[in-house]
Amino acid sequence: MRRGHSSRLVLICTAILGVALLAKTAAPQSTPLRAPTKGGETAAPGLNPAIYHHVAQVIWVVSDLDRVVEYWQRLGVHNVHRDGMVSFPNLTYRGTPDPATAKQVTANIGDLEIKWIQPVHGGKFWSDGLRQHGDGIRVLGYAVNSPREFDDQIKYFSSRGVNLVVQDSWQDPTGRGRIAYLDTAAQGGGHTLALIDQPQTHLPAAVPAANEYPLTKITHFAWVVNDVRKVDAYYTDLGFPPFSRIDHNVSLDRVYRGQPGIYEMWLGWDRTGDTPFEWVQQIVGPDVYVEYGKKHGEGFHHLGVNVSDMDEVIKLMSARGAPPSQDASWKTSKGKGRAVYLDSEPYGGVTLELIYDPR
């Protein structure tokens, strides 16, 4: 009898251990840990870095949608859907109902979704942004994997003193969707970070964007800021990794508006995501950064795309309506790299940068 009880006890213990190990293995690895507090309660959620590895969407606010979209179509963005007049009945601004209507166009460059928005009625965040800063990309959106992740990240940022600016929700054939803009722009270099909870964003893009070269993939995002170190410190304090490096940049072969350039800047690089972020603090001008700052203040400056033959692409894009505005090069172990800004800023407040990097 004792041997029977002992055997059963071993089997029960083994089963319990197996269930515990299985539960541990099945736990999602991207979910931040929740440490129990002294009173046995669950601690507040932490920052989930996996969410911010990829930019899913940019919200690009403009005053003349048709003019801007037609221009970028000429440059090669053809994966475009004209959504028409869109209602946002559930929109709120800083906790107050702010129902809006806006003209909207959705486009894709690679796996990046672009929402061009021209506010018509309501939408205080969009209309105030236009009045204060002009046209431009105002928001970068990051997709969560579940409604719980969405709520947890909002709780986390709230615990760090970051409030919600805009909230919206909707229902479509894919399910219930939500978006929340966080109040990061004032200290974060004009970057409004948004969380998106929408079932269709949980899936990979079904087809690549059918755009013309070189507008087939965005290879970096860039902002003009007043103090790159303060921006770095702000995001580090929120729990993001510090910038990979901050360099005093004095490029070779500098050209600005067809004349020899003397511009210098601090460049901060954040390479923690799948697409690098560049933060530019202007030191010596004139240059396109000074132009941008005078017109828009701090904020999103350019989208970068890679090219294989710089001179050929400059000819191509000039013919499409985007001549060069600034040009510079640098040395690499495999030859000279080169970066050329195109004069697209008058059409939507965003500059397009061509990058040739032989590495």
Question: Which residues does each PLM region occupy?
Answer:
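Bacterial N-terminal signal peptides
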Residues: 10-21
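Intrinsic disorder/low-complexity detector
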Residues: 30-54, 60, 82-92, 122-124, ...
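N-terminal signal peptide c-region/cleavage motif recognized by signal peptidases
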Residues: 23-25
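Vicinal oxygen chelate
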Residues: 29-48, 55-63, 104-113, 115, 129-149, 151-214, 218-226, ...
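Core segments of cupin and vicinal oxygen chelate
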Residues: 50, 60-112, 152-176, 183, ...
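A structural feature that tracks compact, well-ordered secondary-structure segments
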Residues: 59, 71, 117-119, 195-198, ...
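Bacterial N-terminal signal peptides that target proteins for export
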Residues: 2-12
